Amino acid sequence: MKFSFNRLVTQGWKTWERHPASAWVLSILWLLLISFLAFFWNLGSTGLIDETEPLFAEAARQMTVTGDWITPFFNGATRFDKPPLIYWLMAIAYQTFGVNEFAARLPSALTGLALTAMVFYTLRYFGSPTGDWGQGRGGEGEKVLLNSETNQQPNHLLTKAPVIPSSQWQSWLVACLGAAMVALHPQTLFFGRTGYSDMLLSACMGGALLAFFLGYAQPERGTVQARWYLTFYILIALAILTKGPVGVVLPGLIIAAFLLYVGKAREVLGEMRLVRGALIVLALSLPWFILVIWRNGEAYIDSFFGYHNLERFTSVVNDHQGPWYFHLLIVLIGFAPWSIGLPAAISFAGTPWAIAQTKVFQRRNWQQLPRKAHLGLFALFWFLIVLGFFSIAVTKYFSYTLPLMPAAAILLALWWSHKIVQGQIFHQHNGDLKLTSLVSIILFLVLAIACFLCPQWLGDDPSMPNLGLRISQAGLSVIGAVIWGVSAIAGTVLLLRSQTHWLWGVKFLGFVAFLMFVIMPASGIIDSERQLPLRQIAQSVVQVQAPGEKLLMIANGFEKPSLVFYTQRTVTFLDDPSEAASYLKNVDKQARPESLLLIATPKSLKKTGLAPNQYQEITQAGIYQLVRVSRVKVL
């Protein structure tokens, strides 16, 4: 069976190479499939998720209502957290598809698709050693890595290895692996399906870095190189319009460190025409900043540059704090199940491709290799600098590591494709792959146990008290346990049969099955428990609110901005329940509202001190009540 399977794979590779057009068609179908699963499937089937997503969605809606595309507003106040690009894209989607969840999330999904395609393209052309695996010029039985810039053979980079008859199959393999890994993991899955700005930032920043490498790797093709560098500058400008200074600071640090290490800083910066590029970036990004500062003055400068940039790096903002290793844990969890192989992939990336005799991270060897062989090293700098930058930052938040995920996917794809070559062609199975496989099997077992027991842990959120019961009744805990249990069994079989180079397939199929049969149904249940009651309350508000009647919510420290989006009304959020009665007494007397609408839980409603005869219950949904409080009775 083992022989027939290997023969089938080999015949498939040969067919793949004989029909390059078919290879492209199949690859495009592969990209569309994984992108559909990761980003577009049931994209608008659930409501906006409090607290962050409705902030973006409503600010974009306000732009379509007011026609002010310069200053973002939310709930009657300016919102200076982020630059405008995400709002602009959402607003355009609203005008095309209507104001709904699908339109709010479409920019994230499209940029997720674009980033996945960009990773695929880069790996397709530069993801195998020097781009011509097995087509060495050193004669039968050996591989030579040729320095394309000097056209000389560095003798100390000569390694003996069986010649692989062709190279194209590995280029397609590593590209397909990388595309799957960059799209199918928890962190990209979340941000690619929600209306945050983080997926847009990751796509702009990641696309810019990949465009830089595509230009860097082709010095002999001047026109092509210039186009990729132009693309780099445009995407940097878009990254700035998405997140601000970090959109240029992080790529700048990554590229500077990489070029200094390979000793090509002056040479490459000259090729990039840095001054012209800086002018392009400024021309695209600076006008909006000038306009928003001109319109809002010091308030914008203090809020955006001071609070949301400088203070986030130097102090804790919004109580988002954590230990120095916080982002290591986020990578481990957020990039699962692929993250188990990252230590081995990072070590592999530090060694020039297929050079068994060289020392890890030996700079001289990298400097003598052709540029097109540097993708793994570039991804390594990308990964480590983003991780280090946000580990140093005092404010810790789980979205900050998203821009390093494309680099992690590239590192893992290079490593896995190398292991498949070793196992399938050379029948070699190194210790790092066996150890990674063993740890992966343990992870599968842990996930199976966690899925089975999770209903017992899901009753602590007061906004979703019945979540654990609903998950159990739907059978999702058992389904999840079966999926990961079967994955553990399959991984064990591969380990015992010395076929661990195919474990990536088990991870892929396991994660896709978990996405289809557990994550998607569970997201619907979570929405019905957590967000649907708020949408029902919002619908009631729209139906019963009288002209001039104020709308309040007792937030208890957790505001629900989705109420603003779904009611399309201004909502006053109160942290202290006792503030409700005093608010009504002190409200603008000129308006003289006879009553106000109050949204609260039964517990927080009691804490307001209001007697039952002072309010009228209009409706109840989930844990929330909508009541009308009489001003006359309170006074």
Where are these predicted regions, by residue range?
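Membrane-embedded architecture of ER/inner-membrane glycosylation machinery
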Residues: 2-15, 19-20, 24, 230, ...
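Membrane-integral, polyisoprenol-dependent glycosyltransferases
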Residues: 1-429, 454, 564, 620-623
